[in-house]
Amino acid sequence: MAGVFKTVTFLVLVFAAVVVFAEDYDVGDDTEWTRPMDPEFYTTWATGKTFRVGDELEFDFAAGRHDVAVVSEAAFENCEKEKPISHMTVPPVKIMLNTTGPQYFICTVGDHCRFGQKLSITVVAAGATGGATPGAGATPAPGSTPSTGGTTPPTAGGTTTPSGSSGTTTPAGNAASSLGGATFLVAFVSAVVALF
């Protein structure tokens, strides 16, 4: 019976670690999800952020004027909007990142994608260590394999609910955030060692 208790406690602590470390990102921050003045705006926005499994992207936009489509790498590169993996039209759109690898998002309204309303990110494992990935929002090299399973299909109301989520943006690399994470990690490891 003690073994079952230890196992359950360990699993609860692992789940708590994933929830604590998950971040919510408001795509574009104050600019939100709109056709940008600078075609590189969303690439610049994503650069320096580390997107992990369990993080959530929130796309805020004016209903009827924008949308969010999850697409393949080829569709991202060419702003092809005919066959998206998923398509959400009702804001806000919340997408939980639940697989590692590259993820691609575009607006399918008019020529918005061609004018820069598109986002490419690379998602790393929840427990991955290290700082922000340089150029996380940069367009991947041609021929790289796209990931098409990084999000859960949209639910009613335009919300996509992949696994693991929350709702505010904390910039990756934020000193206070990193200190809090380090403190939690020490407590977590201490608890696991004490159990076993």
UniProtKB/Swiss-Prot annotation:
UniProt subcellular location: Cell membrane
Main localization (coarse): membrane
Glycosylation sites: 98
GO molecular function: electron transfer activity; metal ion binding
Keywords, sorted A to Z: Cell membrane, Copper, Disulfide bond, Electron transport, Glycoprotein, GPI-anchor, Lipoprotein, Membrane, Metal-binding, Signal, Transport
Signal peptide segment: 1-22
Prosequence residues removed at maturation: 175-196
Domain Phytocyanin span(s) in chain numbering: 23-125
Record has Cell membrane as a keyword: yes
GO cellular component, one term: plant-type vacuole
Cystine crosslinks: 79-113
Described purpose of this protein according to its UniProt entry: Probably acts as an electron carrier.
Identification of the protein by name: Blue copper protein
Species of origin: Arabidopsis thaliana (Mouse-ear cress)
